Amino acid sequence: MADYQGKNVVIIGLGLTGLSCVDFFLARGVTPRVMDTRMTPPGLDKLPEAVERHTGSLNDEWLMAADLIVASPGIALAHPSLSAAADAGIEIVGDIELFCREAQAPIVAITGSNGKSTVTTLVGEMAKAAGVNVGVGGNIGLPALMLLDDECELYVLELSSFQLETTSSLQAVAATILNVTEDHMDRYPFGLQQYRAAKLRIYENAKVCVVNADDALTMPIRGADERCVSFGVNMGDYHLNHQQGETWLRVKGEKVLNVKEMKLSGQHNYTNALAALALADAAGLPRASSLKALTTFTGLPHRFEVVLEHNGVRWINDSKATNVGSTEAALNGLHVDGTLHLLLGGDGKSADFSPLARYLNGDNVRLYCFGRDGAQLAALRPEVAEQTETMEQAMRLLAPRVQPGDMVLLSPACASLDQFKNFEQRGNEFARLAKELG
């Protein structure tokens, strides 16, 4: 455990994670200073009076006088103020690094462009099914520092690339990169390999590395080694097995679960289940309770969630598809009896949309494109695309056209922040309109 006594600590970024950092230091007899570029950041009213605060901008004077800077994942390490501090030899960490220095129980660590919240939650459910006292959080749910507890027997953390950039003490019992597709390219000017390099930090000092056999970018930089266990659709130690019209989860040649016993559906969710099972096995959880958890887990909101099934039409909320890879995962292997009415749009974060084109060639596809990058998305297949300013306009346009057997799918391939507070608000709005229009 690290000793912070007498250190001049500056925390950048408030919100729930920033407050958890403040509480962490106060409990150790250190009163940090806090700054946030927002004038009235969330959590400002909960900050103890003794804590100095600076809002509306960064305070370079405070930063250059610090012994330790705890940076929010929301601020790029390339920011001039942080670059200057790093050049001056000032240590810059994030909340996950603070957590890793303190945690006494094993850690399962999960990252990836898509599926990480589902897999994190699933591994947590597997641990609970085994009667293990588990703490689940990080990039979802509770900030990691709020999970610290002497009685905790296992931690399961979802980690973003931004969080991994400031983490060096992670020693996971099992770690995975589920997949690597273009995302956050606005934060990674050197492209996909720079983004991948941040993700790969999760494998440093990991006991077992769970890699995706179908995605070479998830492999450690020197290639697979004796620490690696793999999962995949047809390849890998953990893979899918198709026999006589049925699909099984299979581990090293042994069929362990028929997917019809699972509440989750879709090929991408079956591979998520394989990854979760590989992590749970590596963490020493009993296989039987892990499989039981797979039969009861219903999935997370806004992730290929059926919000309405009415008059033979399925309305599916996949608002969490905030990048191209996630929408690809939703469309890959998707079967629709009638027409697929696909809602795309928002802020594409400088991504290349062209990989989507191959999924949009069918005669039964109609595109409804909205938001900041709607025109770019409509250009993927203009003859079947219509462009509107908002998602609501798009839904009101398509609603009179749907027939029994059709599917209305919101899988936007973009962030929501151009028109919504977050992907949850976008998904809730879709669900509300589906119930009104369907």
From Swiss-Prot:
Keywords: ATP-binding, Cell cycle, Cell division, Cell shape, Cell wall biogenesis/degradation, Cytoplasm, Ligase, Nucleotide-binding, Peptidoglycan synthesis
Primary location class: cytoplasm
Pfam families given in the database record: Mur_ligase_C (PF02875), Mur_ligase_M (PF08245), MurD-like_N (PF21799)
Alphabetical list of InterPro entries matching this protein: Mur-like_cat_sf, Mur_ligase_C, Mur_ligase_C_dom_sf, Mur_ligase_cen, MurD
Any single GO BP term: cell division
SUPFAM superfamilies: MurCD N-terminal domain, MurD-like peptide ligases, catalytic domain, MurD-like peptide ligases, peptide-binding domain
Broad enzyme group: ligase
Subcellular location: Cytoplasm
GO cellular component, one term: cytoplasm
Catalytic activity: UDP-N-acetyl-alpha-D-muramoyl-L-alanine + D-glutamate + ATP = UDP-N-acetyl-alpha-D-muramoyl-L-alanyl-D-glutamate + ADP + phosphate + H(+)
Keyword Cell cycle: yes
Pathway named in the protein's UniProt entry: Cell wall biogenesis; peptidoglycan biosynthesis
Similarity comment: family membership: Belongs to the MurCDEF family.
Primary role: Cell wall formation. Catalyzes the addition of glutamate to the nucleotide precursor UDP-N-acetylmuramoyl-L-alanine (UMA).
UniProt-recorded name of the protein: UDP-N-acetylmuramoylalanine--D-glutamate ligase
Gene encoding the protein: murD
